[in-house]
Amino acid sequence: MRAGVFDSGVGGLTVVKSLLEHGLFDEIIYFGDTARVPYGPKDKNTIIRYSLEAQEFFKNFDVDILITACNSVSAHAIEELRSNASFPVIGVIEPGVLALQNRGLDPKSQILVIGTQATIGSGKYQKLLREHGYNNILAKATPLFVPIVEEEIFEGPVLEATLQHYFDSLHPDAIILGCTHFPLIQDAIADYFNNEAVLIHSGEAIVEHLQKELGIKARKKTPSLKLFASENPEKLKKIAAHWLRDAFKTNEL
């Protein structure tokens, strides 16, 4: 079974890591639209256009499923992608909320949702959380985290100052990492909150969804991974080596 994974940049590698670790597919084709990252500040029509263009790329590979590992795309373009596809298209927002619910948190818990302007502004997370009984919601756009990750700043004073800028005086019970770039700095986020907040990671949420809702089971063979980028593929390959720890066979074409 072959899966396509699409993101605006390198952040979707966090979803790829979870998919590889659980062995849900025989092959994963990853495309990062690094020439046009970030999608977060773009308007809805632009995000839809970029997403449909990326979807055309995957038609060259006869994928069985497409995972939009970008919250901005999941917030604004998921229906357009589904109507234009002959295969299932899975977003990251609903799996993230369901993963939170599966943690068994008290409905009165404060839920902090962080993401790009496009994701937070769409209100999709807030709406779904309320539908699942969570009303103590703080949704906060944290766009600076995206270029920080793209610049491979995973620790140090720049990241620490940005964490302070966004999170000063906040004390959430759980945090939904509403951008697939953010798990690359999840250790720093967890440390900032003294490891007291439950973190919901899109990659693990997608795995839960694929297993429970679609019945996809682990394969016995080691999955293969092909990496593609619209610009600077060597940077994508470098970050993949860091994040995936060279644990899997990767080919960058």
Swiss-Prot record:
Substrate binds at D7, S8, Y39, G40, N71, S72, T180, H181. Pathway: Cell wall biogenesis; peptidoglycan biosynthesis. HAMAP family: Glu_racemase (MF_00258). Keywords: Cell shape, Cell wall biogenesis/degradation, Isomerase, Peptidoglycan synthesis. It comes from the Bacteria. It catalyses: L-glutamate = D-glutamate. This is Glutamate racemase. NCBIfam families: glut_race. InterPro entries: Asp/Glu/hydantoin_racemase (IPR015942), Asp/Glu_race (IPR001920), Asp/Glu_racemase_AS_2 (IPR033134), Glu_race (IPR004391). GO terms for biological process: cell wall organization; peptidoglycan biosynthetic process; regulation of cell shape. Provides the (R)-glutamate required for cell wall biosynthesis. Belongs to the aspartate/glutamate racemases family. Gene3D superfamilies: 3.40.50.1860. The active site is at C70 (proton donor/acceptor), C179 (proton donor/acceptor). Its EC number is 5.1.1.3. GO terms for molecular function: glutamate racemase activity. The gene is murI. The keyword Ribonucleoprotein does not apply. The keyword Cell wall biogenesis/degradation applies.
